[in-house]
Amino acid sequence: MKKYYAESELIINSDGSIFHLHVKPEQLADKVILVGDPGRVALVASHFDTQECEIESREFKTITGTYKGKRITVVSTGIGCDNIDIVMNELDALSNIDFGTRYEKDNLRPLQLVRIGTCGGLQPYTPVGTYICSEKSIGFDGLLNFYAGRNEACDLKFEQAFVDYMGWEGNVCIAHPYVIDADKELVNRIAQDDMVRGVTIAAGGFFGPQGRELRIPLADPRQNEKIEKFEYEGYRITNFEMESSALAGLARLMGHKAMTVCMVIANRLIKEADTGYKNSIDGLIKKVLERL
């Protein structure tokens, strides 16, 4: 029996668009690029051959158009896994729920989603300017723990090895990390020889959760030192960002394909940073557009 989605659960605006994004079902392409910064949406769309719609609501900006015959939607998510929860659920609803009847569609429509972002490198081989594909993500955010099917989707052995190594077992103050794979086919298509594949930590904040200490001391001053040295079955943690785990995890549970690729704009180990990255990230955008 198909599930009915009440008005309180699936909020549809009076114009037929989804609540936060303000996008209508017919405005969503099968191929989706996600960016954090609303200003980066225009940069991606500047490469489109045609443009059919442009919508802006809060931090969520959406443009749908075509690139070399491929219909693509680019959406800004803002910062953090909490926003990814909003964006992914609303994109999935646009794709797989009939807004007229409020029932799930008979034929589900899988999306291909690539997040293009920036990150902090954690290894000597990930200097500023490196493109890192998140083959696996470790979620510090705890978001996926609220959804059924979490254990079946995640790499539980990797999770336990990481928790044991960090000394976090039994620490009720920390959301239990989850480890999730990006879609392998999408990774193989996007992450070619010009990109590093690695394990990404999606942190729940920019400062303390990523080991940055300003006026408040860290609960674990050795956090980053331990993270940089962690290894499991040949995997090393390559970078910090704030969205990849929720994207890969929710996509897996919903039946979509998703991955994250980021440009390193700061290396925490080498202690270098580039604040003028906004021009150079265009090269990464072009690569994703060609391969998506």
Where on the chain are the PLM-derived regions?
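Short pre-catalytic strand/loop immediately N-terminal to key active-site residues, enriched for Gly-Thr
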Residues: 234-238
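Short glycine-rich, acidic/polar surface loops and turns
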Residues: 240-256, 261
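His/Asp/Glu-rich mid-to-C-terminal helical/loop segments that flank catalytic regions of hydrolases
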Residues: 267-292
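Structural signal for hydrophobic packing residues in well-ordered secondary-structure cores
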Residues: 48-52, 92-95, 99, 190-194, ...
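Intrinsically disordered, low-complexity segments enriched in small residues
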Residues: 20-27, 204-210, 282-291
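Active-site rim beta-loop-alpha module in soluble metabolic enzymes
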Residues: 158-232
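Metabolite-binding pocket within alpha/beta catalytic cores that recognizes anionic/polar moieties
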Residues: 1-178
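Glycine-rich beta-alpha junction loops
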Residues: 120, 137, 201-208, 246, ...
